[in-house]
Amino acid sequence: MSTFVAGGNVSANGIRQHYLRYGGKGHALILVPGITSPAITWGFVAERLGHYFDTYVLDVRGRGLSSSGPDLDYGTDACAADIPAFAAALGLDSYHLLGHSMGARFAIRAAAQGAPGLQRLVLVDPPVSGPGRRAYPSKLPWYVDSIRQATVGMSGDDMRAFCATWSDEQLALRAEWLHTCYEPAIVRAFDDFHEVDIHQYLPAVRQPALLMVAGRGGVIEPRDIAEMRELKPDIQVAYVDNAGHMIPWDDLDGFFAAFGDFLDHPLV
């Protein structure tokens, strides 16, 4: 039985924020996807999270059905500030925060800025690039080329050239929704991967945090984990050995197993 409750919109931090809600009961959990992942593409993950949490999946500004266009700020600080504003708009006075990739960077920044009610963070394979650091392994044309094709119109089969290991259903959904990713927002986020050093904010994160590392992602290396442990000594680390950067797409069971009991009870 589906745990999907409803979609909705709230006005928060000066923009329209669209979300999908799953579960509807239990402790609140906000899920912030990655750079070109509208909320609906995380539905297969949220369906399972909905068995355990009152789950809200965000369309980050410039993506999906949230506010978009040339007049918005798509920088890290603005996107991070959207998260506690969203929680406040919905009256979520206690919640966990799960971020993947770009969303994990925003989660770190939001926690460091101060996020009332935030209890625990799950940081799924966040890019660790930044000034003076090695580049993020994915390249900007991979994103831009696929967005431009989706804007014209593309099929799931067309999308296979960009995501060769995905299922037909996953490819079709991405092909359907990728055109909602506003190209300047994506470019700004990608640039911030290299221009904003997210490590600087870790010492200000007071909440317990779990770092989930993709074993085949090429994003986080042992030296990165060591540095993050120096900056936040209590950070927990879990590995999904057989997954690439898009962990749930490669190993959904491994993704949920990696939570352990960090969120108070196992998710398997």
Swiss-Prot record:
It catalyses: N-formylmaleamate + H2O = maleamate + formate + H(+). Pathway: Cofactor degradation; nicotinate degradation. This is N-formylmaleamate deformylase. Shares some sequence similarities with the AB hydrolase superfamily. Coiled coil: none annotated. Residues 28-251 form the AB hydrolase-1 domain. It comes from Pseudomonas putida (strain ATCC 47054 / DSM 6125 / CFBP 8728 / NCIMB 11950 / KT2440). It is an enzyme of class 3 (hydrolase). It comes from the Bacteria. Gene3D superfamilies: alpha/beta hydrolase (3.40.50.1820). The active site is at S101, E221, H245. Keywords: Aromatic hydrocarbons catabolism, Hydrolase. It holds the Pfam family Abhydrolase_1. GO terms for biological process: nicotinate catabolic process. Induction: Repressed by NicR in the absence of 6-hydroxynicotinate (6HNA) inducer. In presence of 6HNA, repression is alleviated. One of its GO terms (cellular component) is membrane. GO terms for molecular function: hydrolase activity, acting on carbon-nitrogen (but not peptide) bonds, in linear amides. InterPro entries: AB_hydrolase_1, AB_hydrolase_fold, AB_hydrolase_sf. Changing E221A: Retains 70% of deformylase activity. Deformylase that catalyzes the conversion of N-formylmaleamic acid to maleamate in the aerobic nicotinate degradation pathway. Its EC number is 3.5.1.106.
